[in-house]
């Protein structure tokens, strides 16, 4: 049987980009080019290298189901170990020669049935399908703190760690109390002379231990791959149960809250405990996983500051109460612009439609992967994907399989371009909005899950429902078209 040979561009060589590329190659779709702005694969795990960096999803779950690693050294892997895993995946599946490193896609426009891409070097290329896999959290957010440029010490964002800066014995300020801030305090305590954590909002912490895997355990996992499969299924089941607490009020949510509150009681000083107690429900913000934070924050060389930051001067940080906190290094653990998606790429779809105009009221998509008006364009980890405390590898695999099913239909000549119908997309998003009031994200907090109107942009159901949704294609929800220019130039391929 013969079919056409689709050309596919994937933007991003992180976890999701490599996942969709491997899925394409496994389906016999080989004309694939990956554009990567940096000089290595890995995305988040390449960019983030700060002390204490640890994945908050278990190692045996935060991996591709088709490439399980028997050699994880601990339950929650360090960032460097995950980066090594992703580098190994790139080698194992022959991805490196398909990647254009140091190439930032600055624009992509749909023209006569194909996508025309332009990189920052001015190079243009034309493809049948464009897949954005630029990740969720990759644009560092720098807070507008007055006087930051006046500081005579060193300032950097946690995702742009400066490894030339000595840490031993230094006075280090950590601004931010999310997962990164918590991991930094744990990683710097006992190394720095003093760590001062500046807290705007207290976070709920789930005390998940992080035991190391013995050499014997790794030997057994190498000898018996079924053990890795069993562990993967067991962790998947536990996170499905956790999802019930997120999407529905009831016993599961109460149990998670009870564990968080019990852990907080380990803080002995009543004043410190009150300062660390959030005024919202557990899981309303992204839950912080740490078995060591409450121990670290009680050290004599660690201080929690809850007064707001007024400004920065050359010696340090001045808070609203007029106190000067003298420091040598300021680390901004202030998160990312979670709504930027594939920026800085300027996306122009059918009839000159610009993504900035379509998304002026907030990002939205059909079934988390496609957008009306942008034919043959897909997103990995798009709006309302199950992100947060879920294993993104599993989410990426489901989306990659769905995308490849569409491209295989193109290969067999069923259509030239496809895009979701506006009515189908609106109906889908109406269902999502109707489910949001039951979720924990609407219980009264401000987080990066929310758009500018305070509406969560995450998946309001269990991950299993997301997988089921993507398991089948629904052509009736898509506008399938023919383009003479596409059919005239498409190359045949054995299928």
From Swiss-Prot:
GO terms for molecular function: flavin adenine dinucleotide binding; N,N-dimethylaniline monooxygenase activity; NADP binding. Its cofactor is FAD. Pfam families: FMO-like (PF00743). The record marks 286 as: Transition state stabilizer. Keywords: FAD, Flavoprotein, Monooxygenase, NADP, Oxidoreductase. Gene3D superfamilies: FAD/NAD(P)-binding domain. The keyword Phosphoprotein does not apply. The keyword NADP applies. FAD binds at residues 16, 36, 45, 56, 62, 105. Its EC number is 1.14.13.-. One of its GO terms (cellular component) is peptidoglycan-based cell wall. PANTHER family: FAD_NAD(P)-BINDING DOMAIN-CONTAINING PROTEIN-RELATED, L-ORNITHINE N(5)-MONOOXYGENASE-RELATED. Belongs to the FAD-binding monooxygenase family. This is Uncharacterized monooxygenase Rv0892.
